[in-house]
Amino acid sequence: LLNFAWPQFKFAPRQWLIALACGGIAGLAAPGFDQWYLAWFAFAPLFLLIYANNSYIKQIMLAGAFGLAYNLVYLHWYLNLAPLDWLGFTGAFGYLLAMLAWISVSIHQALAFILFAAIVSRLPLSGSFTAKRGPKKVWLVPALVVLPIAWVLIVNKLGNMPDLMGVPWTMLEYTQYKQPAVLQSA
């Protein structure tokens, strides 16, 4: 019981930089930046980072870094709440509170990305379009079907539930609000 050892993994700065940069780029698809097309490409590195690593801890930490960068960029408007004179917090303290709210909500929303990576990284996925039997006679399900379903259920539905204090402002579908043809085809 006392022989606990922290999981070891090799620190790879390039993977962390990719996670943070791609999360920030995905955040630029938010309304206000109007770079809607970035949402179609910026999430692919997240899936690759999850499946390119064998360490479970590293998978969820990279997903958390991606989610944090995504939410920090997407929720940039929190900084416009300052100065908080209307709440009685003047000067630098109002700016500090706005920044604290921005960071804390971004961290909280990044937890949905961590949960997504924690669940999806354990699923037996295949790159084919149909389910097939893999090694050890385990059925591999197509990633093209499972990943979108998992994203909607975990990040959109569970991560944004008001009961869990989720905020629905960073939902991926909001990035496409000026693309009615894309929305109608879904």
Where are these regions (language model features)?
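Membrane-embedded alpha-helical bundles of multi-pass enzymes
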Residues: 1-186
